[in-house]
């Protein structure tokens, strides 16, 4: 893709993002206000997260699937019970580069929902984060927002292609920046990553989630390895007594998808 085409597409996304943000603020004003009110902060100066106990004899592992889908498509495919999706968040900026035309997972969630309109009402969360960067490994911090309204590919504002789901907003350790600027070792990154994954699952458990939609957490510009992330999630799901019924890893059809399929199927044998 030429730079000109890239720039044109980014400018188009910027325009669409601003239009979507303004439209949501008008059409979904009451729903946004309620979601803002019900959003909880975990970690740091927020709520403590109870650690889920080790599995008891006879406990079951959730039904785990890997789908070559983006998060929103997976949500519309799997949403039945109480469902939450993991937002692979920017640690310091609500919505990441949503209004700047970026197109990573968080920005795509914002384009298809009321999420951005909720995140911007929690500046204290991001201010605290900006003061506690932990050499770019960041910290175990999350926002849990209830009843975010999602639209199927942003195509309509009316049923049946509209639903509500919870969103767990959490940043993965940024190994790319941590190793380059903070002299963080691979072992230090792995320790932070595994604890972050456990933290995410514990927050979801604390909110009684039935269906949890995850994915290649931190495997883009943050530099995490998809195989390691897949094994990390699988490890905690097997070892701890989580009560999720279904866990879906939504990973678009790339090398990351192949790694997730390989590691999850290998771990299941």
Regions found by a protein language model. Name each.
Residues 1-269:
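Macrodomain-like recognition of ADP-ribose-binding/processing modules
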